[in-house]
Amino acid sequence: LTAESGAPSAPAPGVMRVVRVSPHRSEGESIPLIMWTVVLALLPAFAVGLYVFGWRAAYVTVLSAASCVGWEALIQKLRGVRVTVADGSAVVSGVLLAFVLPASVSWYVPVVGAFVAMGIAKQAFGGLGANFFNPALVARVFLQFAFPSQVNMPEWPIVAPQVTGLARLAKSVAPGSPDAVTSATPLAVLKANPGAAWEAIPGSQPFGPPLAWLLPAGAAWAVFALLVAFAAAGIYLEATRGKRLAAVAGVGALLLFGVVPTGDISFGLVPGCIGETSAWALLLGGLALVYYRCINWRLPLAYIVTVAVLASVLPTRAGDGSLVVGFSFERTLVHVFGGGLFLGAFFMITDMVTSPLTSKGQVAFGVIAGVMAALIRLYAGYPEGVCYSILLANATRPLVDRLTMPTVFGSRRRAAPARPAG
């Protein structure tokens, strides 16, 4: 099969058949099935985006997805290869691009971003499976510098909190809209003042695991212990008998009821990009991808845990250049739930084309990206580091694959050539 046409060709005698470029699947799952499953898994986050940002969330998302489909079809026509937009990969890139943009951007911002994603980051490298970097994130970086006043704002709009229910869907967060209120994102507030009181962080109240609100303290801890045992049993059954439903159900119940906190900051009712604000919605979609084995759970787990650990133990540089030293549980919660970490962990760093092939490599890849994200958040001038951390990690993927791929039986790794004396 050729990389773009997908048409079978009979190999000459003694010549091996060339198959499609990655991603390769061995479970009877096609690329369109995987891509459209990802689109469905993004629907919970999209629904939250509609509620938080009004109808413009749908406007930007549909425009971005349609632009990616249109640009990819046009470029494939110009290249003289088969148009493959029905596989859903362009739709996934378009939705993810919209999810990392504010809902208030002008119409041309996602259109230009879609061209960069499809034309430069994807088709210029040969199309699906040949790109080295995540197309949506490449476009996001370009837009950040091309339209800084629309993409990097000091204050971000959301529909006013006093508007409730379905009435929020009819409201607009366009510049100057009377239906919108603006404020800094949780990470921006934390970046400017790492020692800020917890109550000063947008969306911080009320806050706590669901069990803490539903049950008395003693009963909550008892149920939490049962959830831990349930999750451990599920992981054991998945590892020994392949019972992935047990693992996903056990870990999912533990996360949703005992770990991931409630509150505006985790439900997504805070300023930010369209699809990144709700940790709960993204976790639901991510667990679905894990269940259907569209992604390897080790990679998002390694990424999130690395960011959480480093945010807990490393000193933080404040906006005035001073260092804030000391552990803060609330500061760690903001780093985990107050930005784009869950969106990047479940839907971007797990891209099959730009992530390593082996489980060991994916763990290493997640740690590398997590270290980069934490360092950017804590010490660079930009409050969010997910986008850059994943792109930088994408550049290390060939090396990670080389170091973690198992050695073929009966072969040896090629030794480096000896340097001449003198």
Task: Tell me the role of every PLM-derived stretch.
Residues 37-45, 60-72, 89-94, 98, ...:
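Alpha-helical transmembrane segments in multi-pass membrane proteins
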Residues 2-72, 76, 421-422:
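N-terminal signal-anchor module of multipass membrane proteins
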Residues 90, 95-174:
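Membrane-interface helix-loop-helix junctions at boundaries between adjacent transmembrane segments
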Residues 22, 70-81, 118-129, 229-239, ...:
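C-terminal ends of transmembrane helices
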Residues 135-282:
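Long hydrophobic alpha-helical segments that form multi-pass transmembrane helix bundles
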Residues 132-137, 278, 332-341, 362, ...:
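Loop-to-transmembrane alpha-helix initiation sites
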Residues 54-67, 104-113, 215-225, 265-279, ...:
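Structural signature of hydrophobic alpha-helical transmembrane segments
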Residues 82-93, 109-115, 130-140, 241-252, ...:
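Cytoplasmic-side transmembrane-helix entry/capping segments in multi-pass membrane proteins
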